Amino acid sequence: MVKVYIENYGCARNRADGEIMAALLYLSGHEIVESPEESEIVVVNSCAVKDPTERKIARRIRELLDNGKKVIVTGCLPHVNPDVIDERVSAILGVKSIDRIVQAVEYAMRGEKLISVPDWKKRNLDKLDFPRLSPRNVYFILPIAEGCLNACTYCATRLARGVLKSYSPEKIIGWVKWAIKQGYKEIWLSAEDTGCYGFDIGTNLAKLIDEITAIEGEFRIRVGMMNPNHVLKFLDELIDAYKDEKVYKFLHLPVQSGDNEILRKMGRMYTVEEFEEIVKAFRREFPELNLHTDIIVGFPGESEEAFQRSVELIKRIRPDKVNVSRYSPRPGTIAAKWKQLPGWVVKERSRLLHRIRLQISYEINRKYIGKKVKVLIHGEGKKGNVDAVTMNYKHIILPEGRKGEFREARVKNAASTYLLGEIIT
């Protein structure tokens, strides 16, 4: 028996991969421990979407090795930039090789090194066929697909995850029923782009949501990020699916830029106007919609005028949250070859947009004060409070509440990133 600690980075999709590896190790007689200090081997389940994250992970790998730990690196980094991985690691597994984790651990304990980073074209895994060792949270992360149909010029994730492979609705429904039976109250539908789910197997996300909401039980669905160009193809159908009370009125719709020429250079395949069309359609039906979007600042060729169009867009649509990212060139991408903007320009634009988005978020959240909201208790938070979410997935801090309960609360105060409330029933 080997004591293994799994350290996950990046998206929910990656965390689900970590849970598969944990289950495979556990079922093979190994022990999954709660901290690296307790472990003999640390699995660093990496992310490579941004350069700062990549550098942080590379430093972490060196730190673990310097402290005498055996390290296995999994996730996207082995595909995107393997050169930054310390050569002292015991094994390197790509995202299509997580089923070899037991072999990697056993090799490592014998002092042998396993490297398996197959191209996505040569090896595919239906990850719903594998067991999961999931934390006893209120929510269950459920991957519905891997890969995407886009070819964004800045994104390296496609290099690792490949082209879209949707999982069958039957298997997804089976996992939802299992999760509800286990006591989970919240299902996260996760993918690189949930908006293109099913396009390769003759179905779509709206139909999948309809099948899930037909399942008996009190639970909620949180739909993950979707790209606008795919949503446009079935917008009315998706909005109809969202009308079910089991679906959180939460929409993560990344726009990435408010300038159409920059969107064209990014390879995003939609316009600012089309993005706004989707937002308006959702808000007409769901005035309480919690809208999240993403903006990349400092993309190659982004002029001051182009950046200001992004600022104007955010001021105009007023999202509940904007994830602001500074562009960083990723190995193997087209945009990495283009002339880059000075770092100080990118930093300045990021700071400006960040201030604007915090102010907008604060103003939106203040409007909730005094309102009665239904909440799902997620569990213990900081300072003796509990964390919960509203039915449009606003985070709310409460003084009491039992994990997994649906309760009624009243909002008493607000900050940019959360609400404060009290239980009333």
Swiss-Prot record:
<feature type="binding site">
    <location>
        <position position="155"/>
    </location>
    <ligand>
        <name>[4Fe-4S] cluster 2</name>
    </ligand>
</feature>
<dbReference type="InterPro" id="IPR006466">
    <property type="entry name" value="MiaB-like_arc_euk"/>
</dbReference>
<dbReference type="InterPro" id="IPR006638">
    <property type="entry name" value="Elp3/MiaA/NifB-like_rSAM"/>
</dbReference>
<keyword id="KW-0949">S-adenosyl-L-methionine</keyword>
<feature type="binding site">
    <location>
        <position position="76"/>
    </location>
    <ligand>
        <name>[4Fe-4S] cluster 1</name>
    </ligand>
</feature>
<dbReference type="InterPro" id="IPR020612">
    <property type="entry name" value="Methylthiotransferase_CS"/>
</dbReference>
<keyword id="KW-0819">tRNA processing</keyword>
<dbReference type="InterPro" id="IPR013848">
    <property type="entry name" value="Methylthiotransferase_N"/>
</dbReference>
<feature type="binding site">
    <location>
        <position position="148"/>
    </location>
    <ligand>
        <name>[4Fe-4S] cluster 2</name>
    </ligand>
</feature>
<protein>
    <recommendedName>
        <fullName>Probable threonylcarbamoyladenosine tRNA methylthiotransferase</fullName>
        <ecNumber>2.8.4.5</ecNumber>
    </recommendedName>
</protein>
<dbReference type="InterPro" id="IPR007197">
    <property type="entry name" value="rSAM"/>
</dbReference>
<dbReference type="InterPro" id="IPR023404">
    <property type="entry name" value="rSAM_horseshoe"/>
</dbReference>
<comment type="similarity">
    <text>Belongs to the methylthiotransferase family. CDKAL1 subfamily.</text>
</comment>
<keyword id="KW-0808">Transferase</keyword>
<feature type="binding site">
    <location>
        <position position="152"/>
    </location>
    <ligand>
        <name>[4Fe-4S] cluster 2</name>
    </ligand>
</feature>
<dbReference type="GO" id="GO:0051539">
    <property type="term" value="F:4 iron, 4 sulfur cluster binding"/>
</dbReference>
<feature type="binding site">
    <location>
        <position position="11"/>
    </location>
    <ligand>
        <name>[4Fe-4S] cluster 1</name>
    </ligand>
</feature>
<feature type="binding site">
    <location>
        <position position="47"/>
    </location>
    <ligand>
        <name>[4Fe-4S] cluster 1</name>
    </ligand>
</feature>
<dbReference type="InterPro" id="IPR005839">
    <property type="entry name" value="Methylthiotransferase"/>
</dbReference>
<dbReference type="Pfam" id="PF00919">
    <property type="entry name" value="UPF0004"/>
</dbReference>
<keyword id="KW-0004">4Fe-4S</keyword>
<comment type="function">
    <text>Catalyzes the methylthiolation of N6-threonylcarbamoyladenosine (t(6)A), leading to the formation of 2-methylthio-N6-threonylcarbamoyladenosine (ms(2)t(6)A) at position 37 in tRNAs that read codons beginning with adenine.</text>
</comment>
<feature type="domain" description="TRAM">
    <location>
        <begin position="366"/>
        <end position="425"/>
    </location>
</feature>
<dbReference type="GO" id="GO:0061712">
    <property type="term" value="F:tRNA (N(6)-L-threonylcarbamoyladenosine(37)-C(2))-methylthiotransferase"/>
</dbReference>
<dbReference type="InterPro" id="IPR002792">
    <property type="entry name" value="TRAM_dom"/>
</dbReference>
<feature type="domain" description="MTTase N-terminal">
    <location>
        <begin position="2"/>
        <end position="110"/>
    </location>
</feature>
<keyword id="KW-0411">Iron-sulfur</keyword>
<dbReference type="GO" id="GO:0035598">
    <property type="term" value="F:N6-threonylcarbomyladenosine methylthiotransferase activity"/>
</dbReference>
<dbReference type="Pfam" id="PF04055">
    <property type="entry name" value="Radical_SAM"/>
</dbReference>
<feature type="domain" description="Radical SAM core">
    <location>
        <begin position="134"/>
        <end position="363"/>
    </location>
</feature>
<dbReference type="GO" id="GO:0046872">
    <property type="term" value="F:metal ion binding"/>
</dbReference>
<dbReference type="Pfam" id="PF01938">
    <property type="entry name" value="TRAM"/>
</dbReference>
<keyword id="KW-0408">Iron</keyword>
<dbReference type="InterPro" id="IPR038135">
    <property type="entry name" value="Methylthiotransferase_N_sf"/>
</dbReference>
<keyword id="KW-0479">Metal-binding</keyword>
